[in-house]
Each structure stands twice: as C-alpha cells, then as structure tokens.
Amino acid sequence: MTKVQPRALADLIKRPIITEKATVLLENNQYTFDVDRRATKPQIKAAIEELFNVKVTAVNTYHLPPKERRVGRFVGRRPRYKRAIVTLAPDSKIVLFPEV
C-alpha cells in the first residue's frame, strides 16, 4: 500500500450516507460513506481507521451512475460518484449522531 498523508486521507471521505438502506446496515455494524472516485479500498480503510479510531474488517465499494438534471431546456449530468460500505469489528462503533 502506498503511503498517503493524513490530510489526504481526510479528503478521501466526503460524507456519511443516511438513507433507509444505510440505517438498516447500521444494525450489522456497517457504515456507508461517499468517497472520492479515485480512492482505493486500502486507502478508504486507512482513512476510516485514522479519522474515527476504529478497526475496519471489510470495505465494499460501488459506483453510482450520473444523474441527469434539467435546467430549462438544457439537460446536463451530475457527476458520477463512489460509495463505500465499511464493515467494522464487533467492538468498534462510529458515532454519527452525537448525544444532545
């Protein structure tokens, strides 16, 4: 695996995904994130472990297709993006919703 600077690792993870499917996966200790399209599975694993101080057991990724958007009579496309489903060790947990 290539060495990546810690700041570059933080830039790989764009945002957590909170959808119905993602909340069902939370029960299995799996978290879903939007990631940079060029990020590899080892880089995503290193970034999650560095940012959240957890132990990652598996990383699954998939590409979502571009979405068409219409502005008046012009049709454009939103860019493609990549999602990662990260499985954590049973004793690890990421707090997405801090207690108030």
Curated annotation (Swiss-Prot):
Similarity comment: family membership: Belongs to the universal ribosomal protein uL23 family.
Highest taxon listed in the record's lineage: Bacteria
Assembly mode: Part of the 50S ribosomal subunit. Contacts protein L29, and trigger factor when it is bound to the ribosome.
Membrane-spanning ranges: none
Protein's UniProt name: Large ribosomal subunit protein uL23
One cellular-component annotation, GO: ribosome
Keywords: Ribonucleoprotein, Ribosomal protein, RNA-binding, rRNA-binding
Any GO MF annotation of the entry: rRNA binding
Encoding gene per record: rplW
GO BP annotation list: translation
Record carries keyword Iron: no
Physiological role: One of the early assembly proteins it binds 23S rRNA. One of the proteins that surrounds the polypeptide exit tunnel on the outside of the ribosome. Forms the main docking site for trigger factor binding to the ribosome.
Record NCBIfam families: PRK05738.2-4, PRK05738.3-4
The keyword Transport appears for this protein: no
